[in-house]
Amino acid sequence: MRTIGMSDYTVGEDCFAELPAALAEYGATKVAIIGGKRALAAALPGIEAALEGTDVEVLETRVYGTNSTRANIAKVVNSPACQEADVLIACGGGKALDTVKTAAIELKKIVFTVPTICSNCSAATAIAVVYNDDGSLEGYSYPNRPAHIFINPKIIAEAPAEYFWAGVGDALSKQPEVEYATSTGNLEHTAGLGLALAHTCSEPLFTYGVQGLEDVRQDLSSEAVKQIALDIVVNTGYVSNLTNQNDYYYNSSVAHAFYNATCSIPREGTYLHGEVVSLGVLVLFAYTGDTENLERYAAFNKQMGLPVTLEQVGLTEADIPALCEFAHATNEWKQGNPEPFTDEKFAAAIKAANVYGHQLLA
């Protein structure tokens, strides 16, 4: 037996007007609002205005911390207000949303999400990333998918542009990773549906990405910003839920194995998830020998200011052996779809992508 649920979503600058009706669907009269400090500052005015005059009580507004660690998850789990609430409203980027989603597993709570940045698809997914206190990857948790997503393009447009930029970088991975992971065929219905939807993920990025980033840099809520936000949150999020089930995993592949391995490499600088994943996409195409897409995606990375070389994410070719070693611990490597990964091909792909990137920048 398989049951598939997808998040409802409301998009628009007036999206919070739908919040009371969405809560009423679940008989919810008590909520706790959890998120990052900046995210709460952006989202709370609209949420509070929407709830004014209703029978919904906000039990707590809580800053979750700065990363989706076990310690921050425990703070949500141990909050009396979160324990009492009917619905947890999670506001912020992926780490804030993943913290609340993971806490909700133990609390057995419904989660609504408000992505105040669109740096990844966490607002829609039934998967969450958990980090160790030192920032390295602990692994994944598997919560229920959020019940309802509220996407406000104005809030996203007025957030720091680097998160929008990194979100495009992360979303670039969805279509090629799923296409590669499922390339042996023989998919059952749910996985096949996920693959079909994955085919819709890349083109909006190529079509609207450059304009959207320019608009976000001017704090301008535009059609391009909305289309990118929908692609990152909804398209890739729905794909994640369809390609990640108990009996199969096609949701990520070489690009995320690369990213997750980099989390264990000490280096100077701070690099956003999607920023590094976008370089991992080039590694994926080098790994599969897809020169046409390597060139296309690398050219887009360059146009967007996303990385095309190891040095742009604080690494060098001397780090390749360590990247291979750390990659062994990743879920992507362990799943090994469509066939087991090898150190030799992975190392050669990282080097080949890096060499091509340097040629592109020359």
Predicted regions span which residues?
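Short glycine/serine/threonine-rich phosphate/pyrophosphate-binding segments
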Residues: F16, L40-L44, R70, K95-T102, ...
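C-terminal charged capping/lid subdomain of soluble metabolic enzymes
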Residues: R2, E18, D290-A362
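Generic secondary-structure signature for well-ordered alpha-helical cores
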Residues: A24, E52-V56, G135, K154-I156, ...
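ATP/NTP phosphate-donor binding region
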Residues: M1-E84, L310
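A glycine/threonine-rich phosphate-anchoring loop and its flanking beta-alpha core
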Residues: I105-A198
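A short, small-residue-rich loop immediately preceding and capping a beta-strand
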Residues: P80-A103, L107-C118
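Active-site segments that bind and position negatively charged phosphate/pyrophosphate groups
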Residues: E188-A299
